[in-house]
């Protein structure tokens, strides 16, 4: 027989027309004008190869024409239905009925001489059927109905011979070239290239290229390229490229590219790219890219990109990008990007970006960005940004930004920004900004900004700004601004601005502005402005402005302005303006203006202006103007003009003229002329002319001219001209001109001109001009001009101009201009201008300008300008400008600008600008700009811009921009832009842009752009499984399984399985299985199976099976099977079978198709003026007459 040609059987109508309208010739050549080399029925000629296979496409009409054509084997493409083939051209060699065509083909099979012979040796023949390229994506299709098998051999054997030739029934079909060996049992088909060996059991199908070896049990299907080796048990299907090796037990399905090796147990499924190696136990599913290696025990599911290695125990699930290595015990779930390495014991869950390494104990959860390394004991949870390293014992929870290193003992919690290093004992909690180092023993809590170093003993709490170093014993609390160094023994509390150094004994409290140095014994309290140095023994209290030096014995109290030097014995109290020097024995009280020198015996009280020298005996009171020298005994009052020198004891009253020097005791009244220097004790009243210097104790009233210097005690009122310097005690009111310096104790009110320096005690109110420096005690209110420096204790309110530095205690409110630095205690509110640095303890509220750095404690609210760095404690709210870095503990809310990095703890809400990196704890809400990276735990809600990567835990809601990659736990809701990749757990809802790739559990609702599975916009194509819901815009194409619901706009195509509901606009095409409901607009085409309901507008075409209901508008065409109801408008054509009811408008045609046992015949009626009445239902009665369907109690009317 000729090996180059094959015979194909098909049927046409009695006019030789096929279903596409092509008229076949009675003999000669026929060719398709619209040929396409695909495995679909359209765009080509189709038929039954050698007349054996499915009967679904052969006409059952009695007048059908049965055509036999001769086709070149090289042109044949096999279709999915048994025996069906497709070809572009053919030669018609026979036209007749079913029996004659069957005899014709059987005779040609039996007679080798009936066709032209080839030069090859005759062999048992089968027709090679070239296999087209298989698409890399397999679309789900509706369940196909089963049809009877047609075989020309059985037809020829059953029919009476008519000029018969001998008829034979082929049991095997074999085709091979030279050097091949083929051996097959009954009903097998073997096709091989040269040099191949094929052995098959019953009902098997083998196809192989040259040099291949195929061995299969019964009911198997093998396809391989050249040089391949395939061995399969019964009921298996193997497909491989050239040079591959496949071995499978019964019931397995293997697909591999060229050069691959696949070994599978029973009932397994393996898919691999070229050059891959796959080995699996029973009931497993393996999918790998080219060059991968996968090994799995029974019940496992592995998916990997090209070049990957996966090893899994029983019942495990592994997903990896290309070049990854995964090893897991039983019941584990591993997900990794390309180039990653993951190793896990049983019951673990690992998720990592590309290039990561993850090692986990039993029942652990690891999430990491690309390039990270994670190692954990059992029952641990680790989350890390890209390039991080995390090591944890059992029961720990670690979260870190990219490039970080975390090491934790059992039951610890670590949170760090990118590039940080954290080491903790058991039961500890560490939070750090990027680039920080934290080391803590068990039970400690550490919070630090970026670039900081923290070392803590047992049960300690440390908070630091960026670049700080903190070392503490057990039970200590340390708070520092950026660049500070703090060292404390057990039970101490230290707070410092940036660049400060604090050393404290046990149970001490230290507060310092930036650049200060503090050293104290146990149970001491030190407060200093920036750049100060304080040294105190146990039980002392020191307060100093910036640049001051304070040395105190036990139980002493020192207050000094900036640049002062104070030395006191035990139980002393010293107050000095900036640049002063004070030396006192035990029990003394000294008050001085800036630049003064005071020396006092025990229990003395000295008050001097700037640049003065005061010497007093026991319990003396002296007051002098600037430049004066006063010496007083007990209870003297001294009054002197400027440049004067006064010496007085308690109870004296001193008045001095211009340039005088006055020294007076307690309760004195001093009046001085222009340029005078006055020093007064308790309850004094001082009045001085222009350029004077005044010094007074508590309850004094000072009035000075322009350029004066005033020093007053508690509850004093000071007024000074331009360029004055004022120092006041408790509850004082100070007013100064431009460029003044003011120093006051608690509850004082100070007003100063431009460029002033103010120092105030507890509950003071300070107002200063541009460029001022202010230092205030507890509960103070400070207001300063541009470029000021402010230092205040707790509950203070500070307002500063541009470029200021503010340091405040507990519950303070700070407002600063552009470029400021602010440090505040517990529950503070800070507001700063552009480029500021802010450090605050818990429950603080910080607002900063562009490029700021903020560090806040527990429950704080931070707002920062563009390019800021923020570090906050537990339950904080952070808002930052473009390019910021934020680090926060649990329950925080973070908002950042473009390109930011955010790290947040449990239940946080993060919003960031374009290109941000966010890491959040459990139940967080994340929103990020274009190109962001987000990592979140269970129950989180993530929103990201274009090209983002988001990883979230269970019950999360993710929204991402164009081209994003989202990974989430079960029951999640994901929304992504164009071209995104989404992976979600069971019962998830996914919405993605055009061309996305979605992976989800069953019963999910998916909405996606063109090429994805679910809801899509205009012009999209949706493909879904059974029981799906699809909603699409105009000109869409929807494909779904049985039981689905489809809704689309006009000019759409809808395809669904049985039991579906379809709704579309005008000019749409709807196809559905049985028991379906279809509704479409005008000019639509509807096709449905039995027991369906079809509704369309005007000029539509409706086709239904048996027991259907069809309704359409005017000028429509309706066709249905038996027992159907057809209703149409005017000028329509209705075709129905037995038991159907037809009703149409005017000028319509009603056609009833009846089967008389031999052939179909038609009864036709027309509606209108010359026909039957329109809009009346008609049917065919038992006498084959068309009658209208009667209502109840009406007689039927026969239509003639």
Curated annotation (Swiss-Prot):
Ice nucleation proteins enable bacteria to nucleate crystallization in supercooled water. Contains 122 imperfect repeats of a consensus octapeptide A-G-Y-G-S-T-L-T; further on a 16-residue and a regional 48-residue periodicity is superimposed. The gene is inaZ. A structural model is suggested in which the ice nucleation protein displays a symmetry related to that of ice. Its main location: membrane. GO terms for cellular component: cell outer membrane. The lineage of its organism: Bacteria, Pseudomonadati, Pseudomonadota, Gammaproteobacteria, Pseudomonadales. It is found in: Cell outer membrane. GO terms for molecular function: ice binding. Used by snowmaking industry to promote ice nucleation for artificial snow and economize water. Sold under the name Snomax by York. Residues 176-1151 are annotated as: Octapeptide periodicity. This is Ice nucleation protein. InterPro entries: Ice_nucleatn.
């Amino acid at each position: 027989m000729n090996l180059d040609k094959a015979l194909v059987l098909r049927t046409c109508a009695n006019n030789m027309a096929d279903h596409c309208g092509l008229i076949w010739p009675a003999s000669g050549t026929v060719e398709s004008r619209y040929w396409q080399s695909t495995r679909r029925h359209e765009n080509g000629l189709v038929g039954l190869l050698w007349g054996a296979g499915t009967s679904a496409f052969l006409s059952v009409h009695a007048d059908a024409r049965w055509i036999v054509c001769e086709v070149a084997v090289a042109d044949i493409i096999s279709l999915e239905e048994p025996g069906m083939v497709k070809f572009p051209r053919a030669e018609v060699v026979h036209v007749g009925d079913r029996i004659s065509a069957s005899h014709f083909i059987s005779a040609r099979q039996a007679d080798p001489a009936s066709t032209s012979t080839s030069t090859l040796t005759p062999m048992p023949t089968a027709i090679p059927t070239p296999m087209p390229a298989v698409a890399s994506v397999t679309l789900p299709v509706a369940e196909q109905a089963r049809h009877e098998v047609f075989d020309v051999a059985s037809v020829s054997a059953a029919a009476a011979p008519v000029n018969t030739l001998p008829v034979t029934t082929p049991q095997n079909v074999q085709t091979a070239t030279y050097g091949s060996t083929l051996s097959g049992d009954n009903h097998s088909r073997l096709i091989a290239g040269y040099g191949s060996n094929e052995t098959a059991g019953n009902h098997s199908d083998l196809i192989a290229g040259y040099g291949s070896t195929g061995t299969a049990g019964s009911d198997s299907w093998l396809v391989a390229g050249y040089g391949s080796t395939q061995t399969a048990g019964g009921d298996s299907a193997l497909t491989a490229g050239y040079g591959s090796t496949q071995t499978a037990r019964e019931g397995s399905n293997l697909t591999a590219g060229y050069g691959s090796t696949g070994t599978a147990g029973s009932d397994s499924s393996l898919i691999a790219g070229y050059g891959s190696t796959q080995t699996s136990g029973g009931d497993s599913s393996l999918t790998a890219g080219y060059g991968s290696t996968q090994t799995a025990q029974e019940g496992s599911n592995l998916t990997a990109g090209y070049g990957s290695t996966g090893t899994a125990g029983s019942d495990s699930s592994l997903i990896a990008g290309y070049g990854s290595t995964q090893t897991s015990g039983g019941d584990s779930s591993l997900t990794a990007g390309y180039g990653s390495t993951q190793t896990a014991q049983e019951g673990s869950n690992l998720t990592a970006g590309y290039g990561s390494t993850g090692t986990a104990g039993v029942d652990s959860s690891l999430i990491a960005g690309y390039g990270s390394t994670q190692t954990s004991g059992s029952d641990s949870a680790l989350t890390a940004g890209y390039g991080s390293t995390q090591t944890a014992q059992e029961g720990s929870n670690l979260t870190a930004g990219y490039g970080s290193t975390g090491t934790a003992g059992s039951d610890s919690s670590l949170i760090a920004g990118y590039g940080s290093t954290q080491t903790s004992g058991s039961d500890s909690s560490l939070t750090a900004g990027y680039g920080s180092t934290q080391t803590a023993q068990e039970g400690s809590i550490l919070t630090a900004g970026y670039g900081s170093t923290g070392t803590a003993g047992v049960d300690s709490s440390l908070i630091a700004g960026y670049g700080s170093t903190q070392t503490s014993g057990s039970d200590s609390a340390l708070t520092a601004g950026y660049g500070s160094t703090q060292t404390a023994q057990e039970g101490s509390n230290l707070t410092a601005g940036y660049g400060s150094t604090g050393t404290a004994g046990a149970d001490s409290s230290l507060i310092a502005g930036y650049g200060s140095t503090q050293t104290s014994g146990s149970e001491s309290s030190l407060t200093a402005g920036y750049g100060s140095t304080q040294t105190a023994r146990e039980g002392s209290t020191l307060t100093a402005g910036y640049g001051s030096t304070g040395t105190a014995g036990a139980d002493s109290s020192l207050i000094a302005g900036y640049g002062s030097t104070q030395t006191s014995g035990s139980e002393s109290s010293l107050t000095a303006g900036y640049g002063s020097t004070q030396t006192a024995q035990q029990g003394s009280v000294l008050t001085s203006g800036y630049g003064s020198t005071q020396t006092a015996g025990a229990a003395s009280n000295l008050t001097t202006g700037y640049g003065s020298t005061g010497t007093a005996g026991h319990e003396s009171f002296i007051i002098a103007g600037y430049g004066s020298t006063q010496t007083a005994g007990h209870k003297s009052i001294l009054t002197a003009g400027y440049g004067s020198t006064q010496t007085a004891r308690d109870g004296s009253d001193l008045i001095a003229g211009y340039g005088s020097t006055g020294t007076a005791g307690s309760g004195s009244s001093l009046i001085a002329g222009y340029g005078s220097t006055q020093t007064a004790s308790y309850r004094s009243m001082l009045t001085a002319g222009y350029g004077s210097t005044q010094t007074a104790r508590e309850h004094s009233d000072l009035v000075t001219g322009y350029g004066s210097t005033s020093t007053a005690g508690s509850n004093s009122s000071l007024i000074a001209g331009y360029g004055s310097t004022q120092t006041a005690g408790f509850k004082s009111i100070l007013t100064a001109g431009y460029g003044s310096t003011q120093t006051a104790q608690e509850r004082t009110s100070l007003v100063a001109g431009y460029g002033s320096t103010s120092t105030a005690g507890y509950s003071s109110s300070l107002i200063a001009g541009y460029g001022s420096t202010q230092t205030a005690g507890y509960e103070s209110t400070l207001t300063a001009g541009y470029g000021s420096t402010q230092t205040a204790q707790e509950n203070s309110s500070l307002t500063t101009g541009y470029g200021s530095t503010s340091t405040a205690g507990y519950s303070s409110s700070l407002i600063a201009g552009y470029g400021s630095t602010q440090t505040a205690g517990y529950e503070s509110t800070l507001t700063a201008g552009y480029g500021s640095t802010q450090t605050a303890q818990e429950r603080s509220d910080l607002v900063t300008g562009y490029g700021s750095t903020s560090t806040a404690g527990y429950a704080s609210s931070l707002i920062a300008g563009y390019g800021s760095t923020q570090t906050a404690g537990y339950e904080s709210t952070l808002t930052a400008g473009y390019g910021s870095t934020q680090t926060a503990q649990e329950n925080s809310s973070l908002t950042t600008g473009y390109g930011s990095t955010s790290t947040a703890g449990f239940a946080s809400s993060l919003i960031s600008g374009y290109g941000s990196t966010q890491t959040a704890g459990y139940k967080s809400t994340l929103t990020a700009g274009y190109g962001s990276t987000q990592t979140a735990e269970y129950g989180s809600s993530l929103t990201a811009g274009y090209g983002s990567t988001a990883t979230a835990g269970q019950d999360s809601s993710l929204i991402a921009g164009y081209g994003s990659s989202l990974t989430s736990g079960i029951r999640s809701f994901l929304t992504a832009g164009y071209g995104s990749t989404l992976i979600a757990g069971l019962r998830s809802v996914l919405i993605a842009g055009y061309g996305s790739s979605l992976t989800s559990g069953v019963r999910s609702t998916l909405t996606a752009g063109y090429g994805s599975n679910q809801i899509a916009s205009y012009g999209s194509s949706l493909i879904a499984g059974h029981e799906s819901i699809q909603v699409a815009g105009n000109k869409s194409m929807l494909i779904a399984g049985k039981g689905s619901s489809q809704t689309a706009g006009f000019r759409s195509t809808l395809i669904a399985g049985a039991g579906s509901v379809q709704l579309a606009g005008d000019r749409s095409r709807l196809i559905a299985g049985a028991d379906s409901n279809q509704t479409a607009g005008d000019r639509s085409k509807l096709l449905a199976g039995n027991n369906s309901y079809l509704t369309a507008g005007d000029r539509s075409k409706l086709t239904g099976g048996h027991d259907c209901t069809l309704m359409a508008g005017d000028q429509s065409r309706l066709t249905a099977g038996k027992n159907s109801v057809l209703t149409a408008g005017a000028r329509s054509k209705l075709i129905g079978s037995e038991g159907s009811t037809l009703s149409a408008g005017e000028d319509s045609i009603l056609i009833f198709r009846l089967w008389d046992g031999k052939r179909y015949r038609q009864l036709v009626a027309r509606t209108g003026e010359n026909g039957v009445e329109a809009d009346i239902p008609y049917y065919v009665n038992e006498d084959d007459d068309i009658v209208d369907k009667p209502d109840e109690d009406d007689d039927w009317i026969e239509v003639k």
